[in-house]
Amino acid sequence: MEEIPALYPTEQEFKNPIDYLSNPHIKRLGVRYGMVKVVPPNGFCPPLSIDMENFTFQPRIQNLENLDLKNRCRLFFMKQLNNFKRSVKDPSKLILREPYTIVEYSDSTHASEILKKKVYFYDVFSELIKDNRTLTDTTQSFRRKLKFRDISQLRGDISLWRTISKKFNVPIGLLKEIFEKYIASYYIFLHSLNENVHTALHADQYPKSLLSDDEDDFDLGPDSNSGSDFEEDDDDACIVCRKTNDPKRTILCDSCDKPFHIYCLSPPLERVPSGDWICNTCIVGNGYYGFTQDTHDYSLPEFQEYCKRQNSRLLPARKLSIDELEEMFWSLVTKNRRSSLTTVKYGADIHNELPGQITGFPTREFIPKNINGDELIDYLKYCDHPMNLTNLPMAHNSLLPLFKRNISGMTIPWIYIGSLFSTFCWHMEDQYTLSANYQHEGDPKVWYSIPESGCTKFNDLLNDMSPDLFIKQPDLLHQLVTLISPYDPNFKKSGIPVYKAVQKPNEYIITFPKCYHAGFNTGYNFNEAVNFTIDFWLPYGFGAITDYKLTQKACVFDMFDLMINVLDKYNKDTLLFNDAFVRQCYSSLIVFYNTELKRIRKIQAIVPRTTLLEVHTDPNDEDEEYDIFCSQCKTICSIAFVLRKNNYDSIRTYKRHKKNHLSIRQWNELSTTDSKVSILCTQDYLKSIQNLNNSDGEEPYIDDELYFTKSLKDIDSLIKQVGVKLDR
């Protein structure tokens, strides 16, 4: 596999990282490969500056086999089949222990030779359903609906069965036998739900994975002290109505242990049934998977000792090359032996808040006691260096300082402490920003990158491999829990470009916008990472808004706010930015603003009540929220939103004057914890109105309220003033 280019900036170039990375030649390399390696000039080697006495962290526990996309889908499907059989009280008691069956058949070329082959139930199911996906929107890259054909049509589709038979190299008759014996009754159940499959899943703030119990069954060794992959709710509230009343008419799912009122179910039950009862979420499957968190707080020396034991447990006595470690890692990930899960620990996304625990780079807030004299002078130089990751997001020509606040994980570095084969799964950076990852010490980290040119093909490949999973978890690739080997033959077959990097101590990896990346650690190492922006990132930032709406992924900052801040700064001092960049911001803002304004005018013709919110925020409060999110698509409501009443009989219990004094956090909590109201962005509100008008039972929307988060008058004024200055 081709490696990404390594760059060797001069000392002067290294002191101006934004300008250096904006160089057209560097940009072309970044766009082509997705990321580049930056090796600092000789003499740059900042000491690891961590408060060893007080720095602790809780690592994630990773089960490598369950991170593989195909493995996980196969196990999910087996669980779903078993839950279905339990729910219908199948007299056959055919509870599956493995996600496959072994078939025997004669070789077509050598009749005397008997072939044995594993056929995975999910593989058959996914081939049968993948051609039935329908687009809910022509702009969507992820398909959001799945329509199940009538089973008689499915059984009679000879062309489909021939295609599957050819793909698996298994006779059609055997495949049909597998379908009828293991899958058909479950398929009929899903067909009965048809396009409402997604509505059968119960929204749950703390979902449980179907694989949780399996993972809990494995002994993780003497170093294990695992927590849960989801937070426990503080009460026994019904998953549907969120109320804790009527315990005698509350039933627990025998798969996930979640409580439900029997009258909140669809259809409702008259009484609590005897025997096993399984909720629809556990039968259909929610596709959720999360890491288990270790409850033990590790110090750095303690984790290093764990890493030594891990190396002894997993590695031979001789030293392995990077290529051998790489082959071993992907072998562990892609194997499917449920009796021997390989578990590793990864100190990921560590964001402590005290001096000496936030970053491994030198800072003025934490100076080790043993540093003095000339060492102190050098130490302070590193404190102020632009490639100190505490400074990079705020470096000259970066845009993130315009927010005038810290964004955890983006403008404040997060620490990553690896152990052998701990992994970071395929993902892009938030809002397609650039990122810088620096290794302070330890064993190499292996990276893989898929540049922007391969993103669509990569998305299509994953959707093809798991057609139902991306419907249940549309933001799956933002969850950092999914791997597929870049050496999988499907990568080459799909024409997906993929590159590799081996990062060693005192080296930076820079990821460019819209680059998928993943990788693993070859042993103990200490890294940290932060995000930053460059002028050419701007269109990617706007593109992320559209893409995130489709996958219901929340943005971490408001692009409209960023553009407003750029124009406001330029309006006060035209020398702060070059005119070409400001014109780009100006045109992007005009397009966004005019589109939003048209929607607002349509809503004002329907919704008579409008209010301008006056919300005060504290930039020094790290838990402060700055943006109001749409309940439906999770986009930021940059200019306006509608408070939609879902329960008209009780809505008047809400006092209008009280809502005017809610904080942004309270607004967001209102829409997530109270089923009576929703916060809708202007686009989703107009869609909901259209659906009401097209339905037979039209409901009134006279009580809905339009709220402005910004003054249209102020925005108009700023646009006019900047327009005049740009035209000079």
UniProtKB/Swiss-Prot annotation:
Record-annotated residues binding Fe cation? Answer: 427, 430, 517
Identify the domain of life. Answer: Eukaryota
Zinc-finger among keywords: yes
- Keyword check for Ribonucleoprotein, yes or no: no
Q: Which residues form the JmjC domain?
A: 381-549
Q: Which UniProt keywords apply?
A: Chromatin regulator, Dioxygenase, Iron, Metal-binding, Nucleus, Oxidoreductase, Zinc, Zinc-finger
Localization of this protein: Nucleus
Name recorded for this polypeptide: Histone demethylase JHD2
Organism of derivation? Saccharomyces cerevisiae (strain ATCC 204508 / S288c)
